[in-house]
Amino acid sequence: MKILFIARHYSYLRLFESAVVALAERGHQIVLAADRAETMGGRQMVERIAGRYPNVTVCDAPGRYTGAWAEVARKLRLGLDYLRFLEPRYLETPHLRQRAEERAPRVVVWLANSPLGTLVGGRRGLTALLSAAERGLPISAAMKQFLVEQQPDVVLITPLIDIGSPQLDHFAAARALGIRTVLPVGSWDHLSSKALLRAAPDRVVVWNPMQRQEALELHGLPADRVVVTGAQCYDQWFGRQPSRSREDFCARVGLDPGRPFVLYTCSSLFRGTVNEPELVEAWVRALRASTDPRLKGIGILVRPHPARLDEWRGVDLSGHKNLVFWGAHPVDAEAKDDYFDSMYYSAAVVGINTSAFIEAAVVGKPVHAVLLPEVSRDNQEGTLHFRYLLNVNGGLLRVARSFDEHVPMLADSLAPAGGGDEKAARFVEGFVRPFGRGEAATPRFVAAIEEAGTLPAPAREGRSIGAWLAYLVLFPVASLLALHLRSQPWRKRTRHRLVKQFERQRTLALRRIKQFAIDHLGAAGKQRKSATTVGGSVLTPKTGRQRDPAKTLAGTDLREARHTRELVTVMGRSNRPIIVGPWLSETGFELLYWIPFVAWAKAYGN
């Protein structure tokens, strides 16, 4: 069987690494493709797999089509995704709704929240209208050609349901060619916090009964198309042993081997909601302020999230003893060993909202989260998937509402190396391996894909009359948008030319005003007693004096220099404050360069 596996980027495929390897070992021909590049090691991972198995190849997918139709598709899909988050079940998830609203077309947001929207049936009517319009979108010719060339028996697409996902074009192209399709759900939040499925793939592979219920209730999928397999991405942590001793691990990381340590796992939070470095520093201060002897001098290992390294630039944690900031994206053997060892030897795991909680549960560690109001409303209780960590089989997390409440809970839960936490074990049996802790998910996932490949090929989906009508309605919109896009360079050049012309006219006007002031007000100015006696200035000599040639700088007669002098002179004669900056280097050094300007401002200001 030939399997084409298309991911948004190659790092997504790390969630299916064990399944890809198992399918390859069973002799299936596998093509791994991605829509775009990434820098988290995913490409190297799939190339290592392809190097081991000659029946595995790697290539780039065509990605989204560009131009006017791509923009029309994006707007329609973002509008539909926004309408999804207006459903009552999302009333307590304000940031999910806000995120969708920020990306949606303004007209859709306005109609959905205005009385005029009721004329088309409110949210449901708008959804039906936009869905009908979406069916009129042309199918990507590049993707169809790619599928024709590959001739797969089944196409796997992940994640497929990103907000405004262009991968829906892949799905539509496969259906148009009569190719079997599978959505392998990659993560625990995809079905509840992403976009709505527009049509039903032949199979949707989920982890557990909770995700199956989401697929049925949130996406309206037929029950016979949803297959529960367990979470294959976590199989690699079951039964694993550390790669080194605890002493060697602590020496490698830089922690005191004589004290236990807590692992803080950073999260992929909603942008603009939480500054996690500041939160971590506050948490560290709370631990260090504790008088509990169990926490005295305890080690802290802060593990960054690979997608949010930028926010840690410039953060200095060196002032805290027995604390290290360490860890890489686990996409190769060494990084996986490091990650597992950090969990295995930790005494507890702490974080906000991350899949690392689930991995720590597999290892058997006590897991903690602090539900601070300013954090929880967007990133914890303000999401649907976080609630599984609180509820499944009694819940995984030990939660507190403040650092004062959290610190003694953490001290009480400290565990030795290895696993054994009962809350973690119960959660794993309900969420990760619903068929039993000893029943791996990867073989079930492989069986689901093989079964999908034996299904009768779906009929080729042609365009309905409604789709053609929608296309005819969208065509003039796309044509106008195409004209807008093609004229964009010309409009940009024209705008730039007009701005430059305006600036030249403004400069000329300012020169005339200055000359008028010198000619008509100079005599009156000479009668005023000067408050400050100053020497000559390279930039602005006193009225009536000639510039000293010896003080003339090279380039003074350049047009830009003359223009700058005029602007600075006018600025100096205004009554407004002058703000100097920004300081791009050490402030003292910067100030040395600005001293002549400050001296000039003092002498010639007003």
Regions found by a protein language model. Name each.
Residues 2-4, 90-98, 144-164, 346-351, ...:
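Short N-terminal targeting/anchoring amphipathic segment
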Residues 11, 25-144, 148-149, 475, ...:
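Conserved N-terminal ligand/cofactor-binding loop architecture of enzyme catalytic domains
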Residues 128-136, 185, 200-276, 306, ...:
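A nucleotide-sugar donor-handling region in carbohydrate enzymes
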Residues 147-148, 307-358, 363:
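Donor nucleotide-activated moiety binding/catalytic core segment of transferases
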Residues 198-201, 221-223, 228, 355-434:
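Catalytic binding pocket for nucleotide-activated donors in carbohydrate/polymer assembly enzymes
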Residues 235-329, 592-594, 601:
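Conserved catalytic-core segment of nucleotide-activated headgroup transferases in glycan assembly
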Residues 242, 267-270, 298, 397-531:
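C-terminal amphipathic helix plus adjacent low-complexity
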